[in-house]
A protein has these predicted regions:
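Amphipathic/hydrophobic helical signal segments and adjacent flexible N-terminal regions
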Residues: 2-63, 67, 153-161
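Short, solvent-exposed coil/turn segments
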Residues: 13, 74, 147-150
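Beta-sheet ligand-binding and adhesion/scaffold domains
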Residues: 27-39, 110-161
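N-terminal short leaders/motifs
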Residues: 34-43, 80-95
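Contiguous, well-ordered beta-strand patches that form the walls/edges
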Residues: 59-61, 84-133
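Short acidic, gly/pro-rich beta-turn/loop elements at beta-sheet edges
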Residues: 63-65, 101, 148
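Short, surface-exposed polybasic-and-hydrophobic patches located at secondary-structure transitions
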Residues: 66-78, 84-85
Length: 161
């Protein structure tokens, strides 16, 4: 009977020590996410694309010329790219009916994108495939979205008379 009485206090002491040790362990080293890289400026400036545009889209590269002609015909009901309050441009993201300010962003490889602030290219961005001041061609970075919307052709509309 004497041995059983000694085991109980010893068991309580061991369990208490283990529980106390678990409470006093030092936390591991804190890992912090790297700060986001600053956005590179795009070669295309927001002021160059603000205005009234005819818009059409294509899925097959051989349809580009026809699509450009169709876009020119859409100037009766233009797609308006406005100036954003913070220096960006006001446009719609895919699947959104809300205008929002988007940024023109560059990359070290020389490609330009239009999209929300953040990673470049981001999943919501559009790549500026070409721009000559009169015709702006853009495609969505996300392949699924690009498959639905196609490559967009914007043709600058003549100034209002």
């Amino acid at each position: 009977m004497g041995n059983r009485n000694l085991k109980w206090p010893a068991s309580v002491a061991v369990l208490s020590a283990v529980a106390l040790a678990a409470c006093t362990t030092a936390p591991g080293p804190e890992t912090r996410a790297a700060p986001p890289q600053p956005e590179m400026p795009a070669k295309v400036r927001p002021s160059e694309i603000i205005g009234r545009w005819g818009y059409a889209a294509y899925h097959k590269p051989e349809d580009r010329a026809r699509t450009e002609a169709n876009a020119r015909g859409q100037c009766k009901q233009p797609f308006v790219i406005g100036q954003g309050p913070n220096g960006g441009v006001m446009m719609y993201l895919a699947d959104s009916n809300q205008l929002q300010e988007l940024r023109l962003k560059g990359t070290p490889g020389g490609r330009d994108y239009i999209g929300p602030a953040g990673e470049t290219p981001g999943v919501q961005d559009r790549e500026i495939v070409s721009f000559d001041g009169r015709v702006l061609v853009m495609k969505y970075v996300d392949p699924e979205v690009d498959g639905r919307y196609g490559t967009g052709v914007f043709v600058r509309c003549a100034p209002r008379a």
